[in-house]
Amino acid sequence: MHLATSIAALGIVGCSCLRFAAGQGSSTFRFVFTEEPGQYVVGLRVVEQYDHSRTFQLEGGSSEKSAGVGSPRPLQTLVWYPAPRSNNRTMTFGNYEALIKTETSFGKPVEDGKPQKFVESYMEGTTDLPAWAVRDAEMHPGRFPVVIYAPSLNAPATENIELCEYLASQGFVVIASPSMGATSRSMTVDIPGANAEAQDISFLLGFAVSLPDTDMSKVAAIGYSWGGMAALFAAARDKRIDALVSLDGSFRYSPDTPHQAADIHPDRMTIPLLVFSRAEETLETWDAMRQDKNQCACAPNVLNEWTQGDLLHVRLLAISHIQFSSLYQRSERFKKDGLHFVPADYSLEDGIASYNWMARYTLEFLNAYLKHDDTAVLFLKRTPAENGVPKHLIALSLRQASHQPEQANTPAKK
């Protein structure tokens, strides 16, 4: 689980359009999530469960020797949910960090494995900061829409804590598990890897049915990077998913992967899709990626094919791929090295603002298409400037499904 490996594997950094600054970042920079919480307190429950339909090879400690072959697939499941107000103490980011130690070992902490070292390196200096969630809080009465979050390549379920807590505070049950390969902790950038995470999404939806606070008639999937590919696969196969959100999903950069899967047909999908993309690459960068057989093959573009469902494309002009994750932006490492990734003429602070707007647009999209909220619909139809977004941060396009009337003032139901 190495960030540089993830970047290289997915072609997610275009060298020619990024600023490789001589400086070492800003000593005053601090990532702050500024969106206001909703009406609910956030609860968090951690469920250790297995998918007995699939086998998994466990790894043990620093030796990385197999501790068990043919074991059922472990899925450490994080559930953020609306909770009633209380005087209970909220978690810290250090409490979240500790979860990685039993991510696949369940009750047998691993201190120095690759996932543990990865999370520790990005949590360093932030462990005392307060989060929003209250561990094991009571569930708020009622039933709420379900959102499954699919992390990026090899990433933990805690990759976007702020986004998940924010949505839970606004009345959603958000569920996540780690990004893992088909038979082991290491994810692979291929169809078996995407299939594995897509199956995890469907497994989590099956688990969500058992929760007393979920409304399974309103379901969305969110995927970041390689998780975006997996979420696309899941949405194409699992008809319980009513809406899809892609945080710079890999299907834009590896269109041949869904094409090779044979049963993924974006041109037939009728659910709404919200796509966030980073600062665009230059033509030279795209040409270089085309020379990589894993990137930009001659296959139909998913967004161009997405004509039967509404498509909202939000271009975040000020950020690079890794800035879609609060785990990265919040870290001391990013504070030191972030300017190496930021697009030219933008600042680290622009990246903070962009992340916050990403969360806001995600919320409004889910409110519009899952809760059918008229105010959210109007928000999505306005220009970014009309919504208060600084003009240099976002470019937006909204294309309604081909079978819908142009004048429709409410999102189409699935």
Give short role names for the model-derived ranges:
Residues 24-147, 348:
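Domain-level recognition of soluble alpha/beta enzyme cores
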Residues 27-34, 43, 84, 318-322, ...:
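Alpha/beta-hydrolase-fold serine-hydrolase catalytic core, especially in secreted/extracellular enzymes
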Residues 83-122, 158-185, 191, 313, ...:
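Active-site machinery of serine-nucleophile hydrolases
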Residues 159, 189-216, 233:
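Alpha/beta-hydrolase active-site loop
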Residues 221-223, 247:
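Short beta-strand immediately N-terminal to the catalytic nucleophile in serine-hydrolase-like folds
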Residues 223-227, 231:
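Gly/Ala-rich beta-loop-alpha elbow adjacent to hydrolase catalytic centers
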